[in-house]
Design a protein with these regions (language model features):
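N-terminal glycine-rich anion-binding loops that anchor highly charged ligand groups
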Residues: 2, 17-42, 51, 63-71
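Hydrophobic alpha-helical hairpins/lids featuring a short glycine-rich hinge
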Residues: 81-152
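N-terminal amphipathic/basic leader segments beginning at the initiator methionine
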Residues: 1-9
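Conserved small/polar residues in nucleotide/adenosyl-binding loops
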Residues: 161-162
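Short, surface-exposed connector motifs at secondary-structure boundaries
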Residues: 12, 34-39, 107-108, 153
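Glycine-rich, N-terminal phosphate-binding loop and its surrounding beta-alpha-beta segment
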Residues: 42-113
Length: 164
């Protein structure tokens, strides 16, 4: 392992503030669907994708509020298992909601993120991993219909090397 050694005449002390990262916040926001009650994310970036994720959560029946860099998600019973195409196209990473909705309700209906066609894209890794966990998929006119009739279950270790 490499290391960086800094030698200087003054000891370092103090605090720094690191901004939240979108790539961390979005999966956590999707994961709130698997929690009952309220989840509070602090230090969340104020980015278009975070607001798009909140719109998806709201459509699914959650209450999502953003105040400065704090996002609060209140999850009760989901009132929907369908994410409309217009919301799926708002961000490329909207596929991250698939597993959480499927795990919570046993079914999920959505279009491909950003309107992309089925092909060798990162979405295939999501589908393959969920298949190993008990999910079934069918495609109808650009819509992906997903079910987990017996619920999602552990699949040992799902790693990239096990996926096609």
């Amino acid at each position: 392992m490499q290391k960086l050694v800094i030698e200087g005449g003054k000891p370092l002390e103090g605090e720094i503030f690191l901004h939240g990262a979108k790539n961390s916040a979005l999966p956590i926001l999707a994961g709130t669907l698997l929690c009952d009650g309220e989840t509070v994310l602090e230090n969340c970036p104020r980015l278009t994708d975070v607001f798009a994720a909140c719109r998806i959560l709201t459509h699914l029946g959650c209450r999502c509020t953003v105040q400065e860099h704090t996002v609060t998600v209140q999850v009760r019973d989901l009132c929907a298992d369908t994410i409309p195409e217009v919301l799926m196209q708002e961000m490329r990473s909207s596929i991250i909601f698939l597993g959480a909705v499927l795990g919570r309700s046993g079914s999920c209906h959505l279009s491909y993120p950003g309107g992309c066609e089925l092909g060798p894209r990162p979405i295939d890794m999501h589908l393959d991993a969920l298949r190993q966990m008990g999910a079934h998929f069918s495609v109808h006119g650009g819509q992906l219909d997903c079910t987990a009739p017996e619920g999602l279950h552990g699949a040992g270790t799902v790693s990239y090397t096990h996926l096609r």
